[in-house]
From Swiss-Prot:
Organism encoding this protein: Moloney murine sarcoma virus (MoMSV)
Sequence motif: PTAP/PSAP motif, positions: 111-114
Region Disordered, residue ranges: 111-222, 435-499, 513-538
Motif (PPXY motif): 162-165
Site (Cleavage): 131-132, 215-216, 478-479
Lipid group attachment sites (N-myristoyl glycine): 2
Feature: compositional bias, Basic and acidic residues: 163-178, 435-466, 486-499
Keyword Oxidoreductase (UniProt): no
Name by which UniProt lists this protein: Gag polyprotein
Cellular component aspect of the GO annotation: host cell plasma membrane; membrane; viral nucleocapsid
Length: 538
């Protein structure tokens, strides 16, 4: 009684401080609310078998990571820190995670694991389309061209232990049973040395035909970390398959941030990466913004040259990645570089640009919200993920949505207490209930026919009403004429019937007629008196 079921998700929430500390070691930041949302709502929709309560199964984590790192609109750059942190929990579990992690496969007898797979490949190979590993499906795209490694230099890298980054060591031939023995000449090397740039403390995943096992920092036969540089095909593919920093700083910043987090490059790697993906002016702007982000001992930005140069040097520093202090310097350097990329990608404050972002006719509300947030990041100094800016983002989302969606969102009850997530869900519901183009054409045609039928009916009714009115007026006129004639006839008859046969019509006396009436004037008629007209002389 009273017992609760512990799941991987609830376990991470109970040890959230440890999760944040681990994420900080990975040079990323994670938020608890987004952690729960991605684990319980987003990742189960990737159709890779991810449970809503989370899991520490490395295969499932790898499959989710592939989805997150997918290029283009199908990727999820905002979820990179969370899946990377979850992967770190599974590959290097702390004590409170170990009971939930599946037992690791037995380690190989020989340390040359990158050359030969120890067990059959997984049903779905844990590869990421972010990396330029060779895949059969990439041939369908004619542009841009994706280069593959020639394999010549990689054979030398995989058949002998290369020297460390700063401290040359004796060749591997002086050691017995070293892992750097040459591989047989008939065996083909792995496709790309950068397909799996993981930390040296992690065990390599199962090798397959599309995933390279050459790590940037790999433990050699003497237990020392070894350095693997970027390949030219990696840099070429990243440069030619992504827009420039000036054209789309958000997309290129997300790519470089993902590379910095997952590949853990050294100082030289960072300079090579920036020099390839950025122009000279863009690189100088990024470095300047990164140096502005350096903080002093009091936690506030500092301008002291010694502190700035110590944290973000412009010249090659003497940081030994084989030591903990050197790795800490590199982690801090990469964090400052990410901050410099984000700050340099922001344009001058221009709210008109934000207001100009409107939802397209066939654009989903989620995609529109992402574009709106990107405009906030690019053209304003505000962070759209900040809870204090949620009201502004919500109002912009309502006013700049499609007209039909915006009108319905404005009429929502208790709109003031609606969160941005509530508005997006309501907008998605309205968007999904929209009629198709065929339905819209059918509705317009039906409305047009109904309107014509209604107009025709109204015209017929008006014509009938005019006919009835005309008929009533004609009937009234005829009735008036007939009644007038009848009345005149009756009055004439009445007048004639009032005189007697010997009664005078002139004086109305009896005994004579009008021609013999003594009162009637006799004699010829005299001329009528002329009317005199006055003249001007009178």
């Amino acid at each position: 009684m009273g017992q609760t079921v512990t799941t991987p998700l609830s376990l991470t929430l109970d040890h959230w401080k440890d999760v944040e500390r681990l994420a900080h070691n990975q040079s990323v930041d994670v938020k608890k609310r987004r952690w729960v949302t991605f684990c319980s709502a987003e990742w189960p929709t990737f159709n890779v078998g991810w449970p809503r309560d989370g899991t520490f199964n490395r295969d499932l984590i790898t499959q989710v990571k592939i989805k997150v790192f997918s290029p283009g609109p199908h990727g999820h750059p905002d979820q990179v820190p969370y899946i990377v942190t979850w992967e770190a929990l599974a590959f290097d579990p702390p004590p409170w995670v170990k009971p939930f992690v599946h037992p690791k496969p037995p380690p190989p007898l020989l340390p040359s694991a990158p050359s030969l797979p120890l067990e059959p490949p997984l049903s779905t190979p844990p590869q990421s389309s972010l990396y330029p590993a060779l895949t059969p499906s990439l041939g369908a795209k004619p542009k841009p061209q994706v280069l593959s490694d020639s394999g010549g230099p990689l054979i030398d890298l995989l058949t002998e232990d290369p020297p460390p980054y700063r401290d040359p060591r004796p060749p591997p031939s002086d050691r017995d049973g070293d892992s750097g023995e040459a591989t047989p000449a008939g065996e083909a090397p792995d496709p790309s040395p950068m397909a799996s740039r993981l930390r040296g403390r992690r065990e390599p995943p199962v090798a397959d035909s599309t995933t390279s096992q050459a790590f940037p920092l790999r433990t050699g036969g003497n237990g020392q970390l070894q350095y693997w540089p970027f390949s030219s095909s990696d840099l070429y593919n990243w440069k030619n398959n992504n827009p420039s920093f000036s054209e789309d700083p958000g997309k290129l910043t997300a790519l470089i941030e993902s590379v910095l987090i997952t590949h853990q490059p050294t100082w030289d790697d960072c300079q090579q990466l920036l020099g390839t993906l950025l122009t000279g002016e863009e690189k100088q702007r990024v470095l300047l913004e990164a140096r502005k982000a350096v903080r002093g001992d009091d936690g506030r930005p500092t301008q002291l040259p010694n502190e700035v140069d110590a944290a973000f040097p412009l010249e090659r520093p003497d940081w030994e990645y084989t030591t903990q202090a050197g790795r800490n310097h590199l982690v801090h350097y990469r964090q400052l570089l990410i901050a410099g990329l984000q700050n340099a990608g922001r344009s001058p404050t221009n709210l008109a640009k934000v207001k100009g972002i409107t939802q397209g006719p066939n654009e989903s509300p989620s995609a529109f919200l992402e574009r709106l947030k990107e405009a906030y990041r690019r053209y304003t100094p505000y962070d759209p993920e900040d809870p204090g800016q949620e009201t502004n983002v919500s109002m912009s989302f309502i006013w700049q949505s499609a007209p039909d969606i915006g009108r319905k969102l404005e009429r929502l009850e208790d709109l003031r207490n609606k969160t941005l997530g509530d508005l997006v869900r309501e907008a998605e519901r309205i968007f999904n209930k929209r009629e198709t183009p065929e339905e819209r054409e059918e509705r317009i045609r039906r409305e047009r026919e109904e309107k014509e039928e209604r107009r025709r009916t109204e015209d017929e009714q008006k014509e009938k009403e005019r006919d009835r009115r005309r008929h009533r007026e004609m009937s009234r006129l005829l009735a008036t004429v007939v009644s007038g004639q009848r009345q005149d006839r009756q009055e004439g008859e009445r007048r004639r019937s009032q005189l007697d046969c010997d009664q005078c019509t002139y004086c109305e006396e009896q005994g004579h007629w009008a021609k013999d009436c003594p009162r009637r004037p006799r004699g010829p008629r005299g001329p009528r008196p002329q009317t005199s007209l006055l003249t001007l002389d009178d």
